[in-house]
Amino acid sequence: MACMEPPRWHPGITVGVMVTSSRHPRCVLGKRKGSVEAVSFQLPGGHLVFSEMWEECAQRETWEEAALHLKNIHFALVVNSFVEKENYHYVTILMKGEVNVTHDPEPKNAEPEKNGSWEWVPWEEFSPLDQLFWALPCLKEQGCNTFKEDLDHLVGYKGHHLWGTRR
């Protein structure tokens, strides 16, 4: 008879997207509906699917949720969010992408069952920490401001560093 081991939990992996625009000195922020943190604000994003590159996930999720086409998508940073009392542990890969203004440059609520409206919000004016979805409070608590930080060393990096990656 095999000994009973406690279940092994693994963190989820999501991609969040800091959507910017040459027409706005802001970032797209939406009001979340759902089972976890039902009244919180979030960036566009979602689960990374098997074999998907980070850039592809950022493009797909932003289109599915906010009906925006992106260009110049690149890695920004990673946030490890763990909240024991909620049994919540996600690694969020944050990508930064600019709205492609050759398409409609304004966000639309493409998933009204999951999200409220999407709005352009200055980074400094994001909602209070307790109203932000998990990865955002981690960034804000660390004083991170992706609009002021030098991420030039990451431009062009799309997460293709793994063995056997697609090009």
Positions of PLM-derived features:
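Short hydrophobic/aromatic beta-strand or adjacent loop that forms the aromatic wall/cage
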Residues: G12-G16, Y90-L94, N115
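Structural detector for helix-capping/boundary residues
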Residues: G46, R60, I73, V121-E124
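Conserved Nudix-box catalytic region and its N-terminal flanking loop in Nudix hydrolases
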Residues: R23-E65
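Acidic, metal-coordinating catalytic segment for phosphate/diphosphate chemistry
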Residues: M1-G16
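Nudix hydrolase/Nudix homology domain
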Residues: V36-A38, D104-R167
